[in-house]
């Protein structure tokens, strides 16, 4: 028994350790080994996907992925409309197009930011809470607020122009108040 217990202690030694040191200071570029037409992740026809916002749709029984459409270059002051996808397997996607457009330069949601979506069985509406970013806010303006848009069918969205959740109303910043994560409570 003692010999069996000592065997693991003698099987390794400092001579077995091989550490290869790399000189990373001369490396300036890493090239991907992936195929140029990488199809693992969704890529829109134009621009890029920003901040995916996944949501399981209990009505359609599929997943919806809302995202910030990033055109690069984006229009000055108004950017990141919310677009959407649907999928049942996270490998094949159907584009839903633009769901929630940016507001105008003078509106609170000139640029849109990340949000989250819930479905209400009570009124059969989808609710997407998102960040509204004001273009060039004055010192009295809130740079970022949480806003909401609703839809009866996940296709046609209506912005509620009376709902503004402002951080400074609750002791938070009026400049940095974004990316709401909304969930349904026990009360529905």
Report each predicted region and the residues it spans.
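Beta-rich carbohydrate-recognition and catalytic domains
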Residues: 13-188
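C-terminal motif of bacterial Sec signal peptides marking the signal peptidase cleavage site
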Residues: 8-11
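Sec-dependent N-terminal signal peptides
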Residues: 1-4
């Amino acid at each position: 028994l003692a010999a069996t217990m000592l065997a693991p202690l003698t099987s390794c030694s400092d001579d077995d350790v091989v550490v290869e040191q790399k000189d990373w200071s001369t490396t300036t570029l890493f090239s991907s080994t992936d195929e140029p037409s990488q199809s693992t992740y969704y890529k829109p026809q134009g621009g890029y996907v920003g901040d995916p916002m996944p949501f399981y749709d209990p009505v359609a029984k599929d997943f919806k992925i809302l995202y910030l459409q990033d055109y690069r270059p984006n229009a000055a002051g108004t950017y990141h409309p919310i677009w959407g996808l649907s999928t049942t397997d996270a490998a094949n996607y159907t584009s839903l197009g633009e769901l929630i457009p940016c507001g105008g330069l003078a509106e609170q949601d000139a640029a849109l930011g990340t949000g989250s979506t819930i479905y209400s069985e009570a009124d059969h509406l989808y609710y997407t809470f998102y960040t509204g970013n004001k273009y060039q806010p004055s010192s009295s303006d809130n740079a970022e607020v949480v806003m909401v848009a609703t839809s009866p069918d996940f296709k046609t969205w209506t912005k509620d122009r009376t709902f503004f959740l402002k951080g400074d109303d609750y002791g938070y910043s009026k400049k940095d108040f974004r990316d709401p994560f909304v969930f349904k409570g026990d009360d529905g």
